[in-house]
Structures are given as C-alpha cells and as structure tokens.
Amino acid sequence: MGRVRTKTVKKAARVIIEKYYTRLGNDFHTNKRVCEEIAIIPSKNLRNKIAGYVTHLMKRIQRGPVRGISIKLQEEERERRDNYVPEVSALDQEIIEVDPDTKEMLKLLDFGSLSNLQVTQPTVGMNFKTPRGAV
C-alpha cells in the first residue's frame, strides 16, 4: 500500500496547478523548481511531496478533466462543447420514421405539425416470455 497524501499537500498542489498551469509539466524536477520559486514551503520534504503530487495531477489532467481543479483552458473547452450546434438539424430530414407512441408524444409536445413524419408499425422483436429450456 502506498503512502497517504495529507490534505495540505493536496490543497497546495491544486492551488499551484490552478494558478501556474502554464509553467508546469510532466517532469518532477521542473515542477519542484517551480514550486520552490512560487511558494514559501517550509521544508524540503514537503516541497518534494507537493511537487510529486503536482506531477501526478498534471499527468491525470492530460488524460481528461480532474475533479476539484478548474483550469481556464478546460473551462473554455467545456463551454465550447456545451454551446455546440450541429450543421444539419436532426429534424431537417426528408422523412422521419416514428412509431405510433412517439407520434403521440410529439403531438403532446406541440410537435404534431411536423410534416415529414411517417408513422410505421414497430417491428416485433424477440419474444422474451418463453419458458426456460424451451427451444
């Protein structure tokens, strides 16, 4: 079992990453020097632990978003994804095939006026109510 990191190490590393993300990388030694320059860390041991956790978090950030850390670049990326508008709307197709239940739901949602809806009978799927052992 590995060592447990204290909340001091974790909080310090998160704050350092949020403020100085552009100066940090995947290399422990460069991160150690950056931590030494930007923060007053009382001991060498604590500095090394913080730099190690910063390096660990930087590797995780490259794979995807990390909980508890908000970086401007990630915020902008998330914003762009949320505001995405497709080139062609799903409703702009010539004919949209729907089953009768879906047609009723669309009518209740005031989408009954869509002219390109074509009601089709649902295809019968597998019958799951056969007794076990019957072939």
Swiss-Prot record:
The keyword Ribosomal protein applies. It comes from the Eukaryota. There is a cross-link at residue 103 (Glycyl lysine isopeptide (Lys-Gly) (interchain with G-Cter in SUMO2)). GO terms for molecular function: structural constituent of ribosome. There is a cross-link at residue 103 (Glycyl lysine isopeptide (Lys-Gly) (interchain with G-Cter in SUMO1)). SUPFAM superfamilies: Rps17e-like (SSF116820). GO terms for biological process: erythrocyte homeostasis; ribosomal small subunit biogenesis; rRNA processing; translation. Keywords: Cytoplasm, Isopeptide bond, Nucleus, Phosphoprotein, Ribonucleoprotein, Ribosomal protein, Ubl conjugation. The keyword Flavoprotein does not apply. The modification Phosphoserine is found at residue 113. Ubiquitinated at Lys-103 by RNF14 and RNF25 in response to ribosome collisions (ribosome stalling). It is found in: Cytoplasm; Nucleus, Nucleolus. Its main location: cytoplasm. The modification Phosphothreonine is found at residue 130. One of its GO terms (cellular component) is cytosolic small ribosomal subunit. The modification N6-succinyllysine is found at residue 19. InterPro entries: Ribosomal_eS17, Ribosomal_eS17_CS, Ribosomal_eS17_sf. Component of the small ribosomal subunit. The ribosome is a large ribonucleoprotein complex responsible for the synthesis of proteins in the cell. Part of the small subunit (SSU) processome, first precursor of the small eukaryotic ribosomal subunit. During the assembly of the SSU processome in the nucleolus, many ribosome biogenesis factors, an RNA chaperone and ribosomal proteins associate with the nascent pre-rRNA and work in concert to generate RNA folding, modifications, rearrangements and cleavage as well as targeted degradation of pre-ribosomal RNA by the RNA exosome. Belongs to the eukaryotic ribosomal protein eS17 family. Component of the small ribosomal subunit. Part of the small subunit (SSU) processome, composed of more than 70 proteins and the RNA chaperone small nucleolar RNA (snoRNA) U3. This is Small ribosomal subunit protein eS17.
